[in-house]
Amino acid sequence: MKFTEFGEYFRILRIKHKEVLKDASSFLGVSCAFISSVECGKKTIPEEWFDKLVDHYGLNEIQQNELRGAIDRSAKTVKLNIEYVTPTQKDLAVQFQRSFDELDEETANEILEILKRNA
């Protein structure tokens, strides 16, 4: 069974805290089968899990960043709310979406560096 980066991170958290899947099922309020599907990338990671995992495991800032990164890198889709943005920001989002599949690695890295500078 292949796990997503999030799945691996979550399993390590459970092991470090001597918990099994059933324990996570209880505090997340979902079935063990659902958690397993999320860990393997068959189901989307529910947004509320980040806060639940941070609270349950008492994650520090570094661990929170690691968890957020694992969640982000495990996502299959990304949604943007462009309801309250400027027309230029909206054009940027739409153009990025249209061009994304054709971006080469060098251009993607350049865009990433620009965005990191402005974050």
Describe each model-derived feature in a short phrase.
Residues 1-16, 106:
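A short, Lys/Arg-rich alpha-helix, primarily the initiator
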Residues 18-36, 67:
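Short alpha-helical DNA-recognition segment
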Residues 48-66, 73:
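DNA major-groove recognition helix of helix-turn-helix/homeodomain DNA-binding modules
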Residues 28-45, 52:
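Recognition helix of helix-turn-helix/homeodomain-like DNA-binding domains
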Residues 10, 38-39, 49, 57:
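DNA major-groove recognition helix of helix-turn-helix
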Residues 11, 22, 51:
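Residues within the helices of the helix-turn-helix
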Residues 65-101:
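Short, charged recognition helix plus adjacent turn
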Residues 14, 25, 54:
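The alpha-helix within a helix-turn-helix
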